Amino acid sequence: MGSPRWKRFCFLLLAAFTSSLLLYGHYYATVDVRSGPRVVTSLLQPELLFLVRPDTPHPDNSHHKELRGTVKSREFFSQPSSELEKPKPSGKQPTPCPRSVAATAKADPTFGELFQFDIPVLMWDQHFNPETWDRLKARRVPYGWQGLSQAAVGSTLRLLNTSSNTRLFDRHLFPGGCIRCAVVGNGGILNGSRQGRAIDAHDLVFRLNGAITKGFEEDVGSKVSFYGFTVNTMKNSLIAYEAYGFTRTPQGKDLKYIFIPSDARDYIMLRSAIQGSPVPEGLDKGDEPQKYFGLEASAEKFKLLHPDFLHYLTTRFLRSELLDMQYGHLYMPSTGALMLLTALHTCDQVSAYGFITANYEQFSDHYYEPEKKPLVFYANHDMLLEAELWRSLHRAGIMELYQR
C-alpha cells in the first residue's frame, strides 16, 4: 500500500515543480532536440541556439510608443552609439526621388531622431587605420573586432579596394526616378501569396539565408540582386533546408553578396573568396569559396557591412530585453532585419515580403515547408521586437510591409 502513495507523492511534487517553472520566467531557454530539416543546429560553430517562448507579446500601440521602449533599454556596449566612425565619403549619391525613405523618415517625429543616413553602411580598405582598430577592438563582434586578429581583419579589408565596395549599387544605372527595393524574407506568409511578379518588378531584390526560389516563383519571384548572410547562417541553411531544395547559394553574373561580419570566419571566408583560394584556417578550413560564390567571384561582387552600422542599428532600432537574459551575449538582430535595415538606408523605396507580422501564428515558419511548422523563437534574436519595428515603419509610411 505504501508504494502507490509514494508514487502519487512523487508525481504531485514533479507537477508542482513544473508549474512553478512555467510561472517563473518571462522567457525560457532550452535546446531544440527535434529531428528533421527545419531545426537549425549550429553544427558548424560551437555555439548553441536557445529557444525562447514569447509568453508576453509586445504591446500593439502606435509606433511612437513602441519605439520609445526600444531606444531606452540599457546601454550594453562598451562605447555609446555616439562614438561611431566619423562619416567619410560613403559612396552614397544624392537621390532625385521626391518620396524617398530618407525624406519620409526625416519628417517623422520619432524616426527622424533615430535614422542617421550619413553613417557608413559598408566597410572597405579606407576604413582600416590605427584609430579605427583601437576603437573597434573594444567591441565584440559583430559590432567591433574584439578578440579578432588585426592581421586577419586588415588583410581582408585591404582587398575591398574598388569603388563597388563603397556602395551597394550605382545610382546612374537607374536614371530618372526612385530606386525601388524588395527585401524578401523566408516567412510562411508568402506561401500562396502570388507576390512573385510584384517582387520581381522592383529594381533590386534582396534575399537571405535559405532563399529558395525554384518551384516557388509565383509566390516569391526569381530575381536576386543581393544575397545577405553570415557564414554560419549560410552553411546552416544549406544543411537545414537541403531537403526543401536549397542545395546551393544564389549565384549569377550580376548578383552581389553582402557579408555580415558576425565572427572571424566571415572575414576569413571573404578574403579567400576574393583571392579564389581555399579557406586557410578556422572552422571552415579547406572550404572552396567558389562553390558558394561561383567561379568568377572578384572583389567587385562583395559588400561588407560596417561594424559601426550594425552597432547603430542595434542600439537605435533593435535594443532587446534579451540582452538582460542569461544568453544575452548571443543576441544580435536577425539576418532578415539587417538586410531590411540596410535597404532602408540605401534604397529610395522599400517593400518587405516574408517578414514576421502580427498574425504570424497563422502561417508556417517558412514558405517552402509543405506542412505547417510553427515559428520557433531563439534567444539570439528578438522576433517580436522586430515585428513591432516593421509595423511601426509601415504605419509611418517609411516602408511597405506585406501583410494578409
UniProtKB/Swiss-Prot annotation:
It is a single-pass type II membrane protein. GO terms for molecular function: alpha-N-acetylgalactosaminide alpha-2,6-sialyltransferase activity. It catalyses: a beta-D-galactosyl-(1->3)-N-acetyl-alpha-D-galactosaminyl derivative + CMP-N-acetyl-beta-neuraminate = a beta-D-galactosyl-(1->3)-[N-acetyl-alpha-neuraminyl-(2->6)]-N-acetyl-alpha-D-galactosaminyl derivative + CMP + H(+); a 3-O-[N-acetyl-alpha-D-galactosaminyl]-L-threonyl-[protein] + CMP-N-acetyl-beta-neuraminate = a 3-O-[N-acetyl-alpha-neuraminosyl-(2->6)-N-acetyl-alpha-D-galactosaminyl]-L-threonyl-[protein] + CMP + H(+); a 3-O-[N-acetyl-alpha-neuraminyl-(2->3)-beta-D-galactosyl-(1->3)-N-acetyl-alpha-D-galactosaminyl]-L-threonyl-[protein] + CMP-N-acetyl-beta-neuraminate = a 3-O-{alpha-Neu5Ac-(2->3)-beta-D-Gal-(1->3)-[alpha-Neu5Ac-(2->6)]-alpha-D-GalNAc}-L-threonyl-[protein] + CMP + H(+). Disulfide bonds join C97-C178, C181-C347. Pathway: Protein modification; protein glycosylation. Glycans are attached at N161, N191. The keyword Phosphoprotein does not apply. GO terms for cellular component: Golgi membrane. Residues 1-8 are cytoplasmic. It is an enzyme of class 2 (transferase). Its EC number is 2.4.3.3. It is found in: Golgi apparatus membrane. The chain crosses the membrane at residues 9-25. Residues 26-404 are lumenal. Belongs to the glycosyltransferase 29 family. This is Alpha-N-acetylgalactosaminide alpha-2,6-sialyltransferase 2. The gene is ST6GALNAC2.
